[in-house]
Amino acid sequence: MKLKLLAFLLFISGNLFSQEINKENLDDYLNYIEANNGGIGSLSIFKDDHEVYNRSFGQEKLPNITFNQDTKYQIASVTKMITAILILQLVEDGKIKLDTKLSDFYPEIPNSQKITIKNLLEHTSGLGNFAVRNGAIWVMDKVTEKDIFDEIKKQGVTFEPNEKVVYSNSAYIILRMILEKKYKKEYHKIVEQKIIKPLSLRDFASVKSNPENTFKSYKFTESWNEIKDIEYSNVVGVGDIASTTKDLNIIITSLFQNKIIKKETLDLMKPILGKEDWGRGLALFEYGENLFFGHSGDVIGCHSRLIYNPKDKISISYSTNGERFPANIFVENLVNIIYSKEFKLPEIKTF
């Protein structure tokens, strides 16, 4: 039976953020998404360092699956925030410097004598996107580390360091490789040692830890159907981690409480307001006067957003394994609900 699109504006009384987040309005919004097959995912909201809202939506529309509150989502490039934190921990420990040249580790990479660790972190290195070759994604099936490294060298650079900001997956693969050189262990072991154990995370894992109970990717064509996504072992340190939304909020809250890195290091991670959109592992997300810092992640079927507002100590973690309208619209509406502002429900085609 076709569901009619609810074409109306949702008005919420009040204009200022209150200490109590309106869970009923959040439920109404997610009920609308769910009823219209708008997405499949999970939402967690933290306020003052603890969870005040958690809900999954849409999963019951999936055929022949089992899931629970511990089922993980692929968080795609939110993984890069973790990699940046790990690199900056090395900086704090004096084991590497932001101005260390890439040539100290991989002199065979083009322009490595000019590219610094800082350039790699902030997407100003000039390196490209190893995952796309000849205009197509070629990491759908498992490839070797050598294949990836050869592609990075072949693509080279498209501009000189610091000339501009261009998002670079290749830069973060290299940062992961540098981490493994410095620690003399694989990325998933570093994540376990430096992130998972200190924060007592239950449902957070890099792909080589073989995480179980993880959602597959889906696409909607009259119904939700499983689709093939990238091979996550090809993007370790770039987009391979799986997590619950709750564990993601624990991480970003702990980050802004200076439990993972020092305050001055966190300030370095953040983009400079008025000058940058991208920092060194954190990006700026503006929703009117409300400023959040965090990271986004998108692959073929999975999408994730993790953002934190330092002023109000609010964090929003949102992951999907199937969606039919842009995540930025979804999250903007969530922010409007939290701050008691007017917004328009997204139009979702019915079949």
Put a short name on every predicted segment.
Residues Q113-I300, S304:
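Short, surface-exposed loop or secondary-structure junction motifs
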Residues L30, L43, D49, T71-D99, ...:
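Active-site SXXK
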